[in-house]
Amino acid sequence: MIGLLELELHLPEAQSLKDKRQPLRSILSRVRQDHNVSIAEVAHQDDWQRAGLAVVGVNTERVAMERTLDLILRAIEETPGVVCAGEQRQWL
């Protein structure tokens, strides 16, 4: 089962692309280290206070993949200075 999690993030404290980069790098690095998934910024690269992330993982069981995506979402939501403005999941 392939799980895709698309996230729309709001970074209200970012006043420049440099301000945006630090928390995003932290999120990308932490998710890659803690979970066996791929993650990338896929939208709003030139917007200071918005980011679109995509997370893709593979597992033999959908329930296990859902659990992993839930953990990732929770970790991102707990990141200081980052607000999750929307999420969408797809199963392939």
Predicted segment positions?
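Active-site-flanking beta-strand signature of metal-NTP-handling nucleotidyl enzymes
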Residues: 2-8, 55
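Absolute protein N-terminus
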Residues: 1-2, 92
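C-terminal binding/interaction regions
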Residues: 20
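A structural boundary/capping signal
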Residues: 8-10, 36, 63, 74
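C-terminal structural segments of small proteins and small subunits
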Residues: 57-92
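Short, charge-patterned binding micro-sites
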Residues: 40-61, 90-92
